[in-house]
Amino acid sequence: MVILGKLMARRLFLSSLLTLILSLMVAGCGPKPKVTVAPAFRPVAAETVYIVPFTGALVPETFSETVFNDFVDLLNGRRRETGVRSFAILKDEVGAVDVGWLAQQHYVSGEIWSYVEETGCCATNIRVKVRAYLTEPGKRVPSVEIFLPMESFFEHDKSTIDLERGRLARNIARELAVRFSAALSPRR
């Protein structure tokens, strides 16, 4: 009887350990934030960097508005670090802006996609991916690309979906602003 108990405890321990290891391996396979900077990119003090409204398919409008507006506000708060005099919002989509004029400007564009809310009886997980680009004057290919996959998990008795959407949107805006500021900083 004692031997059977030790054997059972050992199997339980080993199966728990195997489950933990496999869980860590699977969690490590998810997408990671990534900043790609072209080798030829050298930050320069720019008068104005224009920011084009981010595109978003199947993303709640208030969510994408919060990401975009907070991102612009945070970038403007970091102007001194970046050497940029101002970050200005272009009111039109990229396709509506004069291509010749835009090609002569520094501008940021981006997209929010893969927004998923998985709700169960007691908790919700929100996942979203964001990609933003900085394109320099005269270049067709962006010089800086930032990819951010982010998520928020919460229990329904601790928070609400609206609060968590707002929190996640503000976190994304903050991460984008920090990473763009670092890329634009002359002290890179």
Question: What feature does the model see in each segment?
Answer:
Residues 27-80, 177-188:
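A structural "domain/chain start" motif
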Residues 1-29:
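Sec-dependent bacterial lipoprotein signal peptides
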Residues 38, 52, 131, 149-151:
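A structural detector for beta-sheet-dominated domains
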Residues 53-62, 119-120, 157-163:
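Second-shell loop/turn segments in exported
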Residues 92-143, 153-159:
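Surface-exposed short loop/turn segments
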Residues 76-101:
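Short beta-strand->alpha-helix linker/helix-N-cap micro-motif
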Residues 125, 135-186:
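Short secondary-structure boundary motifs at beta->alpha junctions and helix caps
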